[in-house]
Amino acid sequence: MKKENLVSVPFMVLGIVFCVCLVAANLLETKVVQLGPVAVTAGLIVFPVSYIINDCIAEVWGFRKARLIIWMGFLMNFFVVALGQLAIAIPAAPFWQGEEAFDFVFGMAPRIAAASLTAFLVGSFINAYVMSRMKVASQGRHFSARAILSTVAGESADSLIFFPLAFGGLMPVNELVKMMVVQVVLKTAYEVVILPVTIRVVNYIKRVDDSDVYDEHISYNVLKIKEI
């Protein structure tokens, strides 16, 4: 069996954290918070971590492993949303006072989840694709620039899809556009601030896992999940 087809402990750990971040972000997106003069969704707290992990996986193990984790994250998010809807459908105990709050969070989830999952798939695959192609083109150099540029590409696509689908008709267009721009800027800034840690993590995993995949002559078809 080829080494790149094996699943290592670092890969599993990053995959688990990736899925947890996505599920948490999907629920946190139901709240809009105020940061000084701008409004952003609370998902900003954790969602950028998924892009950082995406960068790490694409850099160390290549696009095929990133593709697998992206689809796993999608399925975990879908599973949590489905469970939430099931919980809403089951009648609450007569003495329980929290049904309204519970329904608000998970009742909004279907629309936000649909927007989030669609945006997540497009943005994450763009991020992984750009990271993969730039690594081959640069012969593995300039990781910092590749990580930032791939994040800008992925986050821009994510925000352009998510906000109109999730909040269209619920707030003024100018506020929607402002939120989209602010989210991309803040998420990219998040990546830049964490970049020194990301570089150390990537270098450590490459050394420990003895893996540094270059995606030459592979298929970028997002549906070829079996090719790992």
What are these regions (language model features)?
Residues 41, 45, 101-115, 182-183:
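Short aromatic-rich membrane-water interface segments that cap or initiate transmembrane helices
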Residues 29, 33, 80-88, 123, ...:
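Alpha-helical transmembrane segments and their lipid-water interface positions
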Residues 164-174:
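Interfacial helix-loop-helix junctions of multi-pass membrane proteins
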Residues 137-156:
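Internal alpha-helical transmembrane segments of multi-pass membrane proteins
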Residues 202-228:
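Short, highly charged, low-complexity non-transmembrane loops/tails of multi-pass membrane proteins
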Residues 86-109:
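Membrane-interface interhelical connector segments
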Residues 150, 178-191:
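Pore-lining and gate-forming transmembrane alpha-helices of multi-pass membrane transport proteins
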Residues 1-74, 78:
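Hydrophobic transmembrane alpha-helices
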